[in-house]
Amino acid sequence: MTDDATRTLGKGSIPPGPVPEGIIRLYSMRFCPYAHRTRLVLRAKGIRHEVININLRNKPEWYFTKHPFGQIPVLENSKCQLIYESVIACEYLDDAYPGRKLYPYDPYERARQKMLLELFYKVPHLTKECLVALRCGRDCADLKLALRQEFCNLEEGSHTKILECF
């Protein structure tokens, strides 16, 4: 199944049945960058999967059995094993499924990738805050400055020039 055939479940919905053998289920949300990270890995590795979107403003009661805080993304396999948190889910997919490796084999390079991801964590939130401020006609100069600083941190950490794009 592909992302095109998704359904969104909310409060009062019936939980989906068991995950079929040979497929992994992704509990997601259409506009969540963390869930999209997991979707990208599923596609890049060619992993057969189904997507069930969760209404995060009106979460189904049963969903808290999938994630203790009701967050997304969550992976579920046919053995009822659950994996959540996007970075952990992506690493699991890369390790558990054969084919093209997305993470380096070298422990140092793998650690560097994780450190770079840590530096990136503030960027999506600041970007969203800035866009909301602009949409509402509020001044976002301080948010732009903070976002620029995060890009500087990323640039320092990655030893690449990314500010030229911003």
Model regions: which residues?
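GST-like domain detector, emphasizing the conserved glutathione-binding G-site
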Residues: 1-164
